[in-house]
Amino acid sequence: MSKLQDVIVQEMKVKKRIDSAEEIMELKQFIKNYVQSHSFIKSLVLGISGGQDSTLVGKLVQMSVNELREEGIDCTFIAVKLPYGVQKDADEVEQALRFIEPDEIVTVNIKPAVDQSVQSLKEAGIVLTDFQKGNEKARERMKVQFSIASNRQGIVVGTDHSAENITGFYTKYGDGAADIAPIFGLNKRQGRQLLAYLGAPKELYEKTPTADLEDDKPQLPDEDALGVTYEAIDNYLEGKPVSPEEQKVIENHYIRNAHKRELAYTRYTWPKS
């Protein structure tokens, strides 16, 4: 293992192997402890995309909220559907919601807000690329979730995990923003393992991962965008050897996107080289 890989493995907290029952108990306990230590929290808010990550986090949150209510703590899980117009995989979103069984479902179509933002910028002389418009979608989705959380005395739960965090494969202040990130410390295959253990439909954790933010490239697979497979990323995070080419791609993503893992730099915290 290279020196940088060792540093990254320590930072990303991924275990070489997990016991599903123990891991789920630990994840639920983290969520419950956070709620119990912040008496203002009356709701937990999460956007549901129909993908592996939000399905897993949604199920964990609902299980945690159920237990909290049994313990006398009043709180609600609000699952949010955030389509941009008509969502291509809307059936999988509904399948995920049936599996999660959330207390409440809110639907907000982000298309009018995103399109208006893009148009307003265009009128100001700022013409966004399709990729940049994709980031607008991600930020609008998170803005909506925080608005709901503010209205309902809640917090926003994130879906960031270590295979995503290492690559910076999320929008800064978009899907990378949240109050808590329960599944950080898991890689992609471990997330699949937990969903299988929880009895999720295979379609939800065996589907090809995609951020699906670009109009010009609908359902673009994450692995195509990253230039490396999740299998390689997971192996790297577990301290296993990967090919020199895979190592270079992974470490380049890690270094280039370091700013996404930090709060806004100050003159005291900027890591000058």
Swiss-Prot record:
Name the pathway it acts in: Cofactor biosynthesis; NAD(+) biosynthesis; NAD(+) from deamido-NAD(+) (ammonia route): step 1/1
For the ligand (Mg(2+)), the binding residues are: 53, 164
Looking at the Swiss-Prot or TrEMBL record, what is one Pfam family this protein matches? NAD_synthase
Name the chemical reaction catalysed here.
Answer: deamido-NAD(+) + NH4(+) + ATP = AMP + diphosphate + NAD(+) + H(+)
Binding residues for ATP: 47-54, 159, 188, 210
Q: Name one GO cellular component term.
A: cytoplasm
| Keywords for the protein's UniProt record, in alphabetical order | ATP-binding, Ligase, Magnesium, Metal-binding, NAD, Nucleotide-binding
Q: Mention one GO molecular function.
A: glutaminase activity
Please give the biological process terms from Gene Ontology that the record holds. NAD biosynthetic process
EC number, UniProt record: 6.3.1.5
Q: Where does deamido-NAD(+) bind?
A: 139, 172, 179, 259-260
Q: What does this protein do?
A: Catalyzes the ATP-dependent amidation of deamido-NAD to form NAD. Uses ammonia as a nitrogen source.
Q: Which family does it belong to?
A: Belongs to the NAD synthetase family.
Give the multimer and partner information.
Answer: Homodimer.
Know the name of this protein? NH(3)-dependent NAD(+) synthetase
The species is Staphylococcus aureus (strain bovine RF122 / ET3-1)
The upper taxonomy is:
Bacteria, Bacillati, Bacillota, Bacilli, Bacillales
Record gene name? nadE
